[in-house]
UniProtKB/Swiss-Prot annotation:
Region Domain II, annotated ranges: 64-142
UniProt organism field: Lactococcus lactis subsp. lactis (strain IL1403) (Streptococcus lactis)
Gene Ontology BP annotations: DNA recombination; DNA repair
Protein name, UniProt field: Holliday junction branch migration complex subunit RuvA
Domain of life: Bacteria
InterPro entries: DNA_helicase_Holl-junc_RuvA_I (IPR013849), Hlx-hairpin-Hlx_DNA-bd_motif (IPR003583), NA-bd_OB-fold (IPR012340), RuvA (IPR000085), RuvA_2-like (IPR010994), RuvA_C (IPR011114), RuvA_C_sf (IPR036267)
Positions of the UniProt region annotated as Domain III: 147-197
Region (Domain I): 1-63
Length: 197
């Protein structure tokens, strides 16, 4: 198992990044790939979790140990796989997530892609009261560089890759387009806030 990788960030796609470590490119699924844009072609440290299945060996990456700890707790819940856990983390309001779990706010939890009422209830049952301030609260995302409409397009692609439907995204795209000068990460955060209302 790997704890983290140190290497050069060489590629960003809607669901993954590629880190070159000693000439080997590691494909790593992350919650918000475009949050890494400012670090393109630089040395980065990414915390990872490896999932081994019969048909695939996958790496999931995190900006810090707290985000990884949250991911591990989420995938421990029956009904939440790695992709759903990444989609939940991508919302970037981890304190709100923890509050929703502790307060049994099923309506809030079911707004995440791949989380139905049954899974939300299981999250509450398995995770309520198990979060502490050092392990999961206050997870910060990477700072991303400035961008224009390309950033909005990247954000929409990333949200679709996380499981949000095109019809949902169309409803908020006009509002997002009015917010100029945001990074992909900021567009994603705004989109998630709009969809959570």
């Amino acid at each position: 198992m790997f704890e983290y990788l140190n290497g050069k960030l060489v590629k960003i796609s809607p669901t993954n990044i590629v880190i070159d470590v000693a000439g080997i490119g590691y494909l790593i699924s992350v919650a918000n790939p475009y949050a890494w844009s400012a670090l393109m072609n630089t040395e980065v440290k990414i915390y990872v979790h490896q999932v081994i299945r019969e048909d695939a060996h996958s790496l999931y990456g995190f900006v810090n140990e707290a985000e990884k700890a949250l991911f591990l707790r989420l995938i421990s819940v029956s009904g939440i796989g790695p992709k759903s856990a990444l989609a939940i983390i991508a919302a970037a309001d981890n304190e709100g997530l923890i509050t929703a779990i502790d307060n049994s706010d099923i309506k809030y939890l079911t707004k995440f892609p791949g989380v139905g009422k049954k899974t939300a209830m299981q999250m509450v049952l398995d995770l309520a009261g198990k979060f502490d301030a050092t392990g999961t609260v206050g997870i910060s995302l990477l700072d991303a560089g400035p961008a224009g409409n390309l950033a909005l397009e990247e954000a929409i692609e990333a949200l679709q890759a996380l499981g949000y439907k095109a019809t949902e995204l169309k409803k908020i795209e006009k509002k997002l387009a009015q917010e100029t000068g945001l990074t992909s990460e900021e567009y994603i955060k705004s989109a998630l806030k709009l969809m959570m209302k």
